[in-house]
Amino acid sequence: MIDLKFLRENPEVVKQNIRNKFQDQKLPLVDEVIELDAQRRTTQQQADDLKQKRNTISKQIGALMAQGKKEEAEEAKKEVAEFGDELAALDKKQAELEEEVKKRMMIIPNIIDPSVPIGKDDSENVEVQRFGEPKVPDFEIPYHTDIMEKLHGIDLDSARRVAGNGFYYLMGDIARLHSAVISYARDFMIDRGFTYCVPPFMIRSEVVTGVMSFAEMDAMMYKIEGEDLYLIGTSEHSMIGKFIDQMIPEAQLPQTLTSYSPCFRKEKGAHGIEERGVYRIHQFEKQEMIVICKPEDSMIWYDKLWKNTVDLFRSLDIPVRQLECCSGDLADLKVKSCDVEAWSPRQKKYFEVGSCSNLGDAQARRLRIRVAGENGKYFAHTLNNTVVAPPRMLIAFLENNLNADGSVNIPEVLRPYMGGKAKIEP
């Protein structure tokens, strides 16, 4: 949610930003907000003038009584009482106008960073850089679930009978590898100075609408029937929500957190759920990194978060690339974002395994996360980045470490989490 004062003073900037995101249907919202806000301010002024008049007359009542002018005092009391009804009507009107303004402001997209490439959708995202040397072995790499099944590590049929498509049972060394990757990622981030957290896996609707757009909410979130609770789609939701209505002393910034959680997603949209695979599913686990910082530091942290990703994948010897999200592919709250893509030797191309995002002060405005600084109070900036998100990470890991005989090599950094095991064998 952008600053209302900024929109009022820079309507054309906001409109051009909407055009850059190819959301022309939202252009009328800008003028609607300006008109509704003008009505709201007029109503506020009318209420303030009436309150001042009421206070003036109220002060006169005592003087009239002291002078023995009881009839005039009674008339003044009646006038003050009438002000009450009028003020109540004005307050109601103002509240209604504020709600209408808020509804529209929640839909208007955040102002993107000038460095973001202009494009309509993810087909126009721009490759920024690559790390690691992509390899294609001289043997055919099976589909990831075939690799897992040969290693007796996955049971999709049982999961389908129990819960439907989009779920899985991991077993044996594959389940252990899954936990090893999560544990290694956790310790990797702790070693970089991040505080480890395990957050609530459900959040209230106010937090949901504070951390994402309505479109994202509809496509992703599962609601608990009969409760004001939603299952989280990522631990970022809970971790940013942790600071709702908080005034953070500037000296306590930045807040650098790494959180683990299961994640639940409807995956309602163009891609949907895979019939037989673990790339796009309803339930998975993820290690996340979150930063709350001063506005002037957010782009610095954006680069730092991305470097953490590069260093982690390098330590696992998995080639990755950074793909800058174009304007049309950015979610409405994001200022700047890039996809983290890992190399797939089977497909001979990169595929998404995470994302790094700077949301500016959008989430902080919605959730009222402010900072008490030396020069006054201001809204914090929030950022997030995927550390690892198995099982997508497992797909990249298995393909890049597969041997011709179907065994999978375990990198040295993961062996302590695998009981010293150097290889998973059929």
Q: Residue ranges of each PLM-predicted region?
A:
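TRNA-recognition modules of translation machinery and tRNA-sensing kinases, especially anticodon-binding
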Residues: 27, 130-426
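N-terminal alpha-helical targeting/anchoring segments
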Residues: 1-135, 149, 153
